[in-house]
Amino acid sequence: MAEGQVLVLDGRGHLLGRLAAIVAKQVLLGRKVVVVRCEGINISGNFYRNKLKYLAFLRKRMNTNPSRGPYHFRAPSRIFWRTVRGMLPHKTKRGQAALDRLKVFDGIPPPYDKKKRMVVPAALKVVRLKPTRKFAYLGRLAHEVGWKYQAVTATLEEKRKEKAKIHYRKKKQLMRLRKQAEKNVEKKISKFTDVLKTHGLLV
């Protein structure tokens, strides 16, 4: 991948820890990474156990002044961000710079809805977990521990998918028309295409 190019990853269907480890390595190497659809990230193990773990984490606070930390993020994107932070030397200049190169989002906001999104095969649930194993969704966990925007994110995602469908339909139609147009003029331009082929300008 070219230096300075932004790597846009679709978090849906990836395992939390495995994806976080790969993202942490990439940002340390100097790549800019954007992770979208964090609410679709999976966690191995059944939902109830994962919720108990998170509730235990919520109880960890400073007795005399809880506002001093530790801070418990509720949004799936921030939970993922904190997981990555735990894999970086974030108290050093290098680690802080790496963390600044990471952006995380719930849903797919513009301009990333128009960009090609990648997956990480090494972190995919279907590749890494046995089909019989239980797993939980980060979005559901976040919702049950205090995230307020699950419904809003779902609505916006539905709207985005509808828009994408219309765009794809138009694109297919244009491609069909282009092919038809090429077919219509094929005989007329055959002598020109033959000349171009002899000069190696057309394959």
UniProtKB/Swiss-Prot annotation:
The modification Phosphoserine is found at residue 77. Keywords: Acetylation, Citrullination, Cytoplasm, Phosphoprotein, Ribonucleoprotein, Ribosomal protein, Translation regulation. Pfam families: Ribosomal_L13. One of its GO terms (cellular component) is cytosolic large ribosomal subunit. Phosphorylation at Ser-77 upon interferon-gamma treatment in monocytes involves a DAPK1-DAPK3 kinase cascade and is causing release from the ribosome, association with the GAIT complex and subsequent involvement in transcript-selective translation inhibition. Signal peptide: none annotated. It comes from the Eukaryota. InterPro entries: Ribosomal_uL13, Ribosomal_uL13_CS, Ribosomal_uL13_euk/arc, Ribosomal_uL13_sf. The modification Citrulline is found at residues 59, 140. The modification N6-acetyllysine is found at residue 191. GO terms for molecular function: mRNA binding; structural constituent of ribosome. It is found in: Cytoplasm. One of its GO terms (biological process) is translation. The modification N-acetylalanine is found at residue 2. The keyword Acetylation applies. NCBIfam families: L13_A_E. Associated with ribosomes but is not required for canonical ribosome function and has extra-ribosomal functions. Component of the GAIT (gamma interferon-activated inhibitor of translation) complex which mediates interferon-gamma-induced transcript-selective translation inhibition in inflammation processes. Upon interferon-gamma activation and subsequent phosphorylation dissociates from the ribosome and assembles into the GAIT complex which binds to stem loop-containing GAIT elements in the 3'-UTR of diverse inflammatory mRNAs (such as ceruplasmin) and suppresses their translation. Component of the 60S ribosome. Component of the GAIT complex. Interacts with EIF4G1. Belongs to the universal ribosomal protein uL13 family. This is Large ribosomal subunit protein uL13. The gene is RPL13A.
